[in-house]
């Protein structure tokens, strides 16, 4: 059994609750355990994963959050830099499922976050589980 850490950016709590529900369900159904920690926004997710990884307590991570396009350039920065930060950590060998949604509006986020619809939290957890199993096989 592996220990997964879900790191969620708690900016849109009602959407994140659904993402977490989907992720936890996927992890637990696969026979693993998980914990959840919260950070203020998507840009803080890579730093939190780095801090948690340094403890040696976790085998894999799931990054969850919602970034909704607004009227300023801020969306592009947050969407791009949070994805870049997560990707850099995976290239350094960490196992991370990226479930940071980048959407045009709240309705798109709702459909993607809902475990009964697109279930992107569950998908991110399943990606992390798959990569954890691959890393274990190749080690």
From Swiss-Prot:
Keywords: Riboflavin biosynthesis, Transferase. (2S)-2-hydroxy-3-oxobutyl phosphate binds at residues 71-72, 112. Pathway: Cofactor biosynthesis; riboflavin biosynthesis; riboflavin from 2-hydroxy-3-oxobutyl phosphate and 5-amino-6-(D-ribitylamino)uracil: step 1/2. GO terms for cellular component: cytosol; riboflavin synthase complex. 5-amino-6-(D-ribitylamino)uracil binds at residues 11, 42-44, 66-68, 98. It holds the Pfam family DMRL_synthase. One of its GO terms (molecular function) is 6,7-dimethyl-8-ribityllumazine synthase activity. The keyword Transferase applies. GO terms for biological process: riboflavin biosynthetic process. PANTHER family: 6,7-DIMETHYL-8-RIBITYLLUMAZINE SYNTHASE, 6,7-DIMETHYL-8-RIBITYLLUMAZINE SYNTHASE DMRL SYNTHASE LUMAZINE SYNTHASE. This is 6,7-dimethyl-8-ribityllumazine synthase.
